[in-house]
From Swiss-Prot:
Subunit structure: Homodimer.
Entry-linked Gene3D superfamilies: Cytochrome c/b562 (1.20.120.10)
Name of the protein in question: Cytochrome c'
Organism: Allochromatium vinosum (strain ATCC 17899 / DSM 180 / NBRC 103801 / NCIMB 10441 / D)
Function according to Swiss-Prot or TrEMBL: Cytochrome c' is the most widely occurring bacterial c-type cytochrome. Cytochromes c' are high-spin proteins and the heme has no sixth ligand. Their exact function is not known.
Encoding gene, per UniProt annotation: cycA
Length: 154
C-alpha cells in the first residue's frame, strides 16, 4: 500500500510541476529537462506494467503505475514546449523535431488520444483484470508510438 501511495504522490507532483511550468518562469533548458523527466518516469511506469503483464501479476503495482501515467498525461505537459524548447539549448539535448511545433493541431489530436488512453488504462487497472489491462496498455503504447514516429528524432 505504501508503494501505491508513493507512486501516486509522485505522479501528482509531476502533475503540479508541469501545469505550473510556464507560470513559474522556467527557462527553455528547464522546460526540456522537466518534460524529459516526466516522460522518463512515465516510461519507467510503463516498464513496470509490462513486467507485470509478462510475469507474476501484481494488481497493486499495476494500478499505482497506471495512476502515475494518467497523472502525468493529464498534467499539462504541453506547457513544457514553450518558445526556445524546439532545439538543443546548451548542454540540454532534445529529440523533438521542428515539425512538432509546425503541426500543433495534429499534436493536440495525438495528445488527446494519449490522455484518453492513459485515463482508460488507470480505470481498467483499478479493476485488477490483467487481460483488460493488457489491451489498455497496448492502446497507451500505440498512442505514444504515434507521436514518437512523427515528432521525435531517433
Amino acid at each position: 500500500m505504501k508503494h501505491v501511495l508513493a507512486s501516486t504522490a509522485a505522479g501528482l507532483m509531476a502533475l503540479g510541476l508541469a501545469s505550473s511550468a510556464i507560470a513559474a518562469g522556467l527557462s527553455p533548458e528547464e522546460q526540456i529537462e522537466t518534460r524529459q523527466a516526466g516522460y522518463e518516469f512515465m516510461g519507467w511506469n510503463m516498464g513496470k506494467i509490462k513486467a507485470n503483464l509478462e510475469g507474476e501479476y501484481n494488481a497493486a503495482q499495476v494500478e499505482a503505475a497506471a495512476n502515475v501515467i494518467a497523472a502525468i498525461a493529464n498534467s499539462g505537459m504541453g506547457a513544457l514546449y514553450g518558445p526556445g524548447t524546439d532545439k538543443n539549448v546548451g548542454d540540454v539535448k532534445t529529440r523533438v523535431k521542428p515539425e512538432f511545433f509546425q503541426n500543433m493541431e495534429d499534436v493536440g489530436k495525438i495528445a488527446r488520444e494519449f490522455v484518453g488512453a492513459a485515463n482508460t488504462l488507470a480505470e481498467v487497472a483499478a479493476t485488477g483484470e490483467a487481460e483488460a489491462v493488457k489491451t489498455a496498455f497496448g492502446d497507451v503504447g500505440a498512442a505514444c508510438k504515434s507521436c514518437h514516429e512523427k515528432y521525435r528524432a531517433k
